[in-house]
Amino acid sequence: MQHGSLGPSSSSRKTTVTSTAGSVHLHHRSSNGFSTASRAQLNRHNEMDFGKMFAAMEKGHKVCKIAVLKKWDPAYKQLTLDRYSRQIFLTKLELSAVRNKPTILDIRQIREVQTLNYKLNTIKVDDKWKKDREIVNFDSKAILIISYGMGFALSYWILLFESEDACKLWSQGLHNLMMDTRDRDSSPHPLRIERFLHKHFLSLMSPANDAVARKHMKPFVQTSLQFKVQSDQLQQVTEDQMNSDQFSFASRQLIHVPELFSSRFADLAEKHERKGLVVTFQNFLRFLDGKQFDELASNRTRALEFLNRYFQEDQAYFGDRNEPSMTVFEFCDFLFSRENSLWDPTNEKVTHDMSRPLSHYWIASSHNTYLTGDQLRSESSLDCYAQALLMGCRCIELDCWDGQKKPGSAEFIDIVIYHGYTMTSKILLRDVLHVIRHYAFVTSEYPVILSIEDNCSVPAQRLLAQELKDILGDYLLTQPANREEKQLPSPAALKKKIIVKHKKLPIESEDLAAVVKTDEFQDTEIISRECVKKGILMVKNNNSHEWTSHVFILFPDRLCYLIQTADPENPNDDTVSVSGDEEREEETPSGFGVKPEEMHVTEEWFHGRCERDEAKKRILEHKEKGNGLFMIRDSNLFIGDFSLSILHDGKVHHVRIRSKIIDKEKKYYFMDNKVCDTLYELVSYYTRHYLTTAHFKMVLTIPCPQPQPHLNQPWFSATADKEKAEELLSLVPEDGAFLIRTSSTDSSVYVLSLKVDGEFWHYRLKRDGRIFVVNQKVFENLNQIVEFYANREFVRGISLRFPVNEKDISHLTAELAEARTPGCYMDLKDLDKEVQARALRPYRGTADDELSFPANVIITVLRKEEGLWRGRYGSLTGWFPSAHVQEILPEKVSTSETSNYNTIELAGTLIERIHDADRPNVIRISQSNQHWMNKQYYLLAASSSEEADGWQNNLFELTRSVNTKMSILRTKEKEKRIAAELSNLVVYCQAVPFDPAHIYNDAFYEMCSFVEGKLDKLVEKGLLPFNSRKLSRVYPNGSRITSNNYSPVPMWNAGCHMVALNYQTGDKPMQLNQGKFLANGRCGYLLKPDYMLTDDFDPTNTEKFATAYPIRLNVQVIGGRHLSRKDKNKGICSPFVEIEIIGMPCDTKVFQTKTIASNGLNPIWNQTFTFEIQCPEVALIRFHVEDGDFVGPKTDPFIGQAVFPVDSIRCGFRSVPLKNQYSEELELSSLLVDVQMCSREGTQLIRSSSHFLQASRLAPVFAHRKITNGDSIPREMAPRLRTSATDRSLDSPTNSESRATLLSGQRGSQDSMDSAAETSSIASGTISSRDGKKKQNWLKKFSFGKSSKS
């Protein structure tokens, strides 16, 4: 396939279609694909003409895609551009290639475009490039490196061009396209919509006619757009063959919900003689003023300029250039645009006062900055430092270790960075420092702190100090900013300076005792201790003979391994391969995995295998529905064909649907005059056109309902709601009790209610027409689901065991009561702490429902029966004899290291290499003095012979040493020494152990670091006043080997400055970190509110903060657009939104909306929630969207998230652009919310949270600006404030409840939709207070809460 068919030529003029009700108008944009503003900006930075540049890129160039330090395909490929979809294509040139479908890269995913010459000679890194013997022989100016990805770790296209000029052209062109595509200001929302639709048009169109066939639309709508579309609706908006404009028009028709505008903004619409309903410029200004509280409304010139940028000059104008208008659909698009974001763009600049001491700021900080994934096997990468710095991180970590020495000399030639004693790869310190120098001040000009985790010998430390000085040069801070200072300098005073954090030699003495003093607040996790070797080995269970993977840590006197298993076959999913070698075919959209030619399978009218007589019976059962009642079934006489059964004048007629092969494709028809590609299209055609036979002439009007074999089943209840279902399930004491019912809010939706671990879980069964999709398996009816999961795990090891309904419940409970021993059942779900037991000896279960486990492991007990307990070990759940375990009393349950690892003492052991039938490379460890007794031994297996040799040699050496000194263990670590050269570079961040006696001393330049679990103890010892004067850094427990993160909120609330997180992990803590540091221009420094700097500050008693300004925040979640999971092919999502305030313990609260079934394209919620926030200056608001349907062990319900500081959001009708787990913006995915903010008493309206809640922290230039805030509710707001959340719903447009009442008294949720029994707990705004039950220690007061189950 030639790329010429993939997109328009460079000279073509792109047109798109938008529509009002019944009207269409065309929009044109510049032929080079740039918006006007971005075109002018880019022309200033590039000497080449963009039109010619992009024309050359669209024509294409020959390249080889190469790989570093691995084999690669030397065949030439064609690299081409489609400027309108913003995609580049890599297509094989061989005409005989079987798979000639191009590899596609979306430019919005590109992070950097650099030539190899730029990396080697400008950034000055050698890294892997100099190690590759093939690459060093090529011209570095002809190699282009494209870094891309939507996570932290990046992938790469490394392309070798035929000439330097071609490489330079693509480097400049892609860089400019990347900046225009990714930059929030130069890619307006209408242009983003055009690109989105054009991309999908290219992926669906046929090269033969440059059109999309109707048969591809339903899979596209159900999979890509995530919308359960009805056949008649699709027929109305689509054509048999659609060009780009028709495809765009059809897609937009499906996206828009007319009621969204009519229920809220009808007063803004005016009739236009040619364009139907429009929003005039004057009404748009009225909207900005009255509903958005936007200062833009008062400046007509700026408002015009804003619309110019948004609509790109000529799109919005219907005549008078000074009186632009927009259609209703365009106005709704604007509501969901990022130009209308909840985020206040004034915070894109540095607005905080940056002249305060460093200890007054939170500082964005990274842990293990060099890692792309977990702490055992992942790759160390220079790009991780670049990415962290570009994200605004200001404190990065360097784990430094001795590198190579000169041959025959003790002098070191390099220092390496990696995670010591593990299989993580190594990178050179000098390369890292070059990258830091290059990227340190691109995003922010404020100081960067290097946290040196020094594991080097003293000679290597001298080299470390020399490389810091040589490479960082003038950026490196080596002298105080002011010799007379009595406190830490400010970020402004340290602009473009790099600060070294390290221990420092004592000034007055060579005695190093103070330096090596043990810090009780450091990480005590075993995996973090200094060791000889660390890695993953398999260990054999001597009873079950099963092999499991564990992390082993070798010390001089013992070998330890973590009880938690480590699966080397399944590395961290968050880690992205850095090879970028992904020559894979693009997935084609298919609804629920069904191909276009099989789309009839999901339709209500398709009945599959059904005999002629049975078909007649089914139709006559519903004959009251009248003529045109029909069904399609498999033909009994002609295998592979189908038959139509239809009701006409009380009689059932059967008509054969014929098929024939045309151009190697199967076609379907009744008559030769109409032939269709698919059965679905054929039936859809005759739902709008007459089918004429010898006996009748009629339209297929009503699908015959599917049979309902579930109605008389013992597990089905037609009347039970959520509460009744839980009441019935509670009568059955066993897990696995279940029933299926209809949803209280939608009778077409079925819900499975199931008892799991003593709790009641409710699953909405995902349905597409006649089929159900459960755990990615397809079922034709409910009976099949129940039969399938009757003896298979549905969730958490539970199958559907005990069917329940109103009719049979008494009989079932009598049977269970008779079979059980009375009084010995114990449900543990309500205990504050889990009951745990230690295995006294191993147990190997013989039945499927029994639990197997080795000795000395911890088992979570779920239930007890006489002689038999049920528990969970790892991911397994089952029954086991209680005599094999000993219960651990609650007060003795310990989280210490003794409970998470086992120890093999090396003293007196025999190390042998043996041959095992199960595994190669096996090492046996046994006691050397036990020859005939039933001795205990360990069998360990390595993944390779070389790895086994390494472990065996280390074990031999250490065992010999330990056996000669049985009574004396080797010292764990030698006295630490610090090179004077390195000590001299440490000025402000002098690392010392935390000492309560020194909190108030004058050593402001000292700082402490401590592990996350020590926060409680440190707060008790005076951490809060310490943090107002000196710096502190928190880092994760060493046991977090997957690089998962801890909650940073307790540490921020305690005033800790550098809360170091693993930036490579896209989890909730990192999302909160990204959201918090959006503020203050994303510079990485946030000024704390004044009340956190006082001596009496106490996060648990915020009521006494006189300087805090308590507020009431109302958030109505109106709707969403383009919501989908990452795996779109696994069904249409049913989204719900979780809204959470995270901050001080008293403020933390979460609400959840109801679930909208099978609609990710344009769901509507209309639910309002109220938050009372005592300390809004430190609070974050988090939106989290999930699929409410997803169940199963390998499913990810995540749809999107967004986090904003409460003091940085705008009021009014605003969009919430959603992001992925790594806080990268998703394409067009957003929520629409209505946000109102006022004083907690409800008397003062807050128009701008940024200026009002940040007032005491703003720089003078911003603080002196005139702000209208804290006013009484203005007169022009009265009409809106008299409208409650219920007023603006789609269901009830008129209601007289006043907004003033809402602001002053509303607690919980005002749900404008049907609040039937099933959703009452959600719709009423059921909350889960974050402080909840009183905790025993300070840290737990800040733990994340969970929303209430619904």
Curated annotation (Swiss-Prot):
Molecular function (Gene Ontology), one example: metal ion binding
Q: Which cofactor does it need?
A: Ca(2+)
TM region(s), chain numbering: none
What do the Gene Ontology cellular component annotations say?
ruffle membrane
The PI-PLC Y-box domain covers which part of the protein?
982-1092
Q: Does the keyword Endoplasmic reticulum apply?
A: no
Q: Which residues form the C2 domain?
A: 1099-1220
Q: What class of enzyme is it?
A: hydrolase
Domain SH2 span(s) in chain numbering: 605-704, 715-804
Q: Check the record and name the InterPro entries matching this protein.
A: C2_dom, C2_domain_sf, PH_domain, PI-PLC_fam, PLC-gamma, PLC-gamma_C-SH2, PLC-gamma_N-SH2, PLC-like_Pdiesterase_TIM-brl
- The SH3 domain, residue ranges: 832-890
Q: What happens when the gene is disrupted?
A: RNAi-mediated knockdown causes sterility resulting from impaired spermatheca dilatation causing a defect in ovulation, and a severe decrease in sheath cell basal and peak ovulatory contractions. The few embryos laid are arrested at the embryonic stage. Cycles of posterior body wall muscle contractions are prolonged and arrhythmic resulting in a defecation defect. Ca(2+) oscillations in intestinal cells are arrhythmic and the whole cell current amplitude is severely reduced.
Q: Where is the PI-PLC X-box domain?
A: 352-503
Q: Which residues does the entry assign to the active site, renumbered to this chain?
A: H367, H419
Q: In which tissues is it expressed?
A: Expressed in intestine, isthmus of the pharynx, proximal gonad sheath cells, spermatheca and uterine sheath cells. In males, expressed in the valve cell, the vas deferens and retractor and ventral protactor muscles.
PH domain boundaries: 855-960
- The annotated regions of Polar residues compositional bias extend over 31-40, 1283-1329
PANTHER family for this protein: 1-PHOSPHATIDYLINOSITOL 4,5-BISPHOSPHATE PHOSPHODIESTERASE GAMMA, PHOSPHOINOSITIDE-SPECIFIC PHOSPHOLIPASE C FAMILY PROTEIN
Identification of the protein by name: 1-phosphatidylinositol 4,5-bisphosphate phosphodiesterase gamma plc-3
Gene (UniProt): plc-3
